[in-house]
Amino acid sequence: MKIDLILGLQWGDEGKGKIVDVLTSNYDIIARFQGGPNAGHTLEFDGIKHVLHTIPSGIFHDKKLNIIGNGVVIDPVIFKNEIEKLKELNVDLKEKLIISRKAHLILPTHRLIDQASELSKGKKKIGSTLKGIGPTYMDKTGRNGLRVGDLEMEGWNEKFENLISKHLNLINNFNVEIDFDIEELKKEFLSSIDYMNELMFIDSENYFHNSIEKGRKILAEGAQGSLLDIDFGTYPYVTSSNTTSAGACTGLGVPPNKIGDVFGIFKAYTTRVGSGPFPTELFDEIGQRMAKIGNEFGATTGRPRRCGWLDLVSLKHSINVNGVTELIMMKGDVLSGIEKIKICTGYKYQGSVVNHLPFSLSDSSLEPIYEELDGWNEDICKTTDYDNLPLNFKNYINYLEEKLKLKIKIISVGPDRKQTIFRK
């Protein structure tokens, strides 16, 4: 048995939460492998919207186990809030959620470092979510971090206090003004730890090995998007983890030969939150229309998302880096009513035409090259069968499949789990 992966192919916000929720019935275990509460995975069913930040998106399904892998960073305060909301919905977390001992903890001072760092950059800020993600991964690679398993060890509180002291010295070096009460922040953090201690901690790499041996079906859930990958994204406007398929191996402790299907999710157009290059960004009425109809606001930050045409150059880059085997297209319904739909097929870059992602998308000479297709006017939100979709919508799908050389197996036409079309 192999582990299947589900990954975003753009700058995040592709709709991974919904699709994980839709596919969970086919699996025994759902596992998050990287990122932290900077993620906002939105699920909608029975007319109610749910947003998850750290907990895997299979949590609402009975008899499904959800695992937070070692590659994830956890903020106990935000985690506590997630737990409380799920308890209100009568979700039995003790039976459905376990955590890797090797996952790192986000301390309150990690958030303060994030804030101080961003303030110190002025106009050159990268658009951090200010959740302390980057500083936590810095402590991880710097071998200073506090891990979930430390909570089971004697003297973890001393390690916590020492790390807080180091962080406070670092914050002072930024020479920016930040208001905070460290004692209140520590008190809130320590009280939130009690909620984590109610759950089971595991040696996740061993757990996954045994689960694979027993033939249990596992779906690994990525966070953010491939274009935010620390190595292969639009650096430095990226997140601090590997959001690509390789991150599932290191973030769960599974070998590459145990990876099965890789499901790549993309929107029918492109969005981005925060700073960073965006070659196909729209500043006109069409971009505003996409944002309004697509409800393009970050589930974590609430910030409006920038919108633009679909970019096949960056999409192919993500497909290649991840080894995608099947495609899933989200929000095709948002494009209804647009007369002409543009698709970026290449870039003019430093006097040449390129069909790959160059070293920097910020180069002033970079200009997208577009092809154009006829749009459709029909409302497709209630369509449940592919054959009943408008001809021009199907032409759009066929065009993308030809260009990307992959089948689009699932099409989402709305936020609810029922608004999903499966293709044979």
List the predicted regions and their residue ranges.
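Non-transmembrane, aqueous-exposed alpha-helical and coiled segments at domain scale
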Residues: 1-424
